């Protein structure tokens, strides 16, 4: 969150369930509360800080067992024209590069653009841009707004949906192929 402070954002708040990380961030000038992001936390943030123009979740969605609940909490604090930005390991890279370490790293979920797009639509939100990156062996950064928000959906979303279809990421044999590759 330091980058937002450096860009001049004034009302910055971190949320992290790890006490040590929250304390260290606060000590370094980024006020951070030590708790999970859920509806109760969101209501407290809203009451004390108001709506957020930007909400980020870097490598958080992979560890959450209630994705809809966390997304509801994010929606509670996000301004109607706000932007939600998340980073997750990219399922296509996990499968094609056989990133078994990613799987053993306590991740509960692995994300494709197709699945995230569908999930977000069910939450009255829309994926408007996606970037691929090298983090964790392969990651995506998704940019999200409320459905019908002020930003256009970028070509990057359609391009990665097309890539996933071409690579047959939606077919069970693709995942089985990873399993078979690990067995050999």
Regions found by a protein language model. Name each.
Residues 10-16, 34:
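Conserved SAM-binding motif I beta-strand of class I
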Residues 28-44:
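Conserved SAM-binding strand-loop segment of SAM-dependent methyltransferases
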Residues 68-85:
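A short glycine-rich, Lys/Arg-flanked "PGG" loop and its adjoining helix->strand segment in the class I
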Residues 53-56:
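A conserved beta-strand element that flanks and buttresses the S-adenosyl-L-methionine
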Residues 84-109, 113-120:
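Short, glycine-/aromatic-enriched active-site segment of Class I SAM-dependent methyltransferases
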